[in-house]
Amino acid sequence: MSLEDPFFVVRGEVQKAVNTARGLYQRWCELLQESAAVGREELDWTTNELRNGLRSIEWDLEDLEETIGIVEANPGKFKLPAGDLQERKVFVERMREAVQEMKDHMVSPTAVAFLERNNREILAGKPAAQKSPSDLLDASAVSATSRYIEEQQATQQLIMDEQDQQLEMVSGSIQVLKHMSGRVGEELDEQGIMLDAFAQEMDHTQSRMDGVLRKLAKVSHMTSDRRQWCAIAVLVGVLLLVLILLFSL
């Protein structure tokens, strides 16, 4: 199987989440079957955990469906047999049906009626029936479960507090970096101004040098012209001298 295919990673997470949800669902069903008023804390915690777990599973199933769509759109890349692809679709459909079954039970009229009746009994402080010894044992188990839930909530609160402290430290570091970046930006702006002034000075110096070079070229041209006239005068003088000598002979 291609290492780029993420199906099996997500599938394992979904299977584990469904198993956890089934455990919560079983406990939730047991709470619905108890004749005495159920503790609000345990019932609320179980209901919320189950509802959140089912919602998370649905999101994971959507991810699995996306991976199946990717494989179907790129059969040459993944080279997945048709039987394996169908097996994946069956798995997603089976998990979705299990999730939907639990969701339907949670919103069924029977469950809603029980929750409303349980809330009324808790508020009134009156149990629905006389507690038997087995009910007392169940109450003891519920009390132990409540203590466990309280401990877990306290642990989660400590973790959240530590995360808040870490976020504050990160926020402080970000502020320091922001201040440093502002200082660096100001220094870069100052250096840019200095470079602009230096460029202007270089342009002015270049202009002055061009003027000097033009003057030197002009003087050099004038000097060259004088030398040419002097040479012509000397040649004319020599020619006249030769003519005089020829005629004198």
Curated annotation (Swiss-Prot):
Keywords: Acetylation, Coiled coil, Golgi apparatus, Membrane, Phosphoprotein, Protein transport, Transmembrane, Transmembrane helix, Transport
GO molecular function, one term: syntaxin binding
Domain t-SNARE coiled-coil homology: residue ranges: 157-219
Residues that bear Phosphoserine: S108, S134, S140, S143
GO biological-process terms attached to the record: Golgi vesicle transport; intracellular protein transport; regulation of protein localization; retrograde transport, endosome to Golgi; vesicle docking; vesicle fusion
SUPFAM superfamilies, alphabetized: SNARE fusion complex, t-snare proteins
Stretches in topological domain Cytoplasmic: 2-228
Coiled coil: 41-69
A GO cellular component entry from the record: endomembrane system
Superkingdom, taxonomy of origin: Eukaryota
Membrane topology: Single-pass type IV membrane protein
Biological role stated in the UniProt entry: SNARE involved in vesicular transport from the late endosomes to the trans-Golgi network.
Subunit details: Interacts with VPS52.
Name by which UniProt lists this protein: Syntaxin-10
Organism the protein comes from: Homo sapiens
Lineage: Eukaryota, Metazoa, Chordata, Craniata, Vertebrata
UniProt gene name: STX10
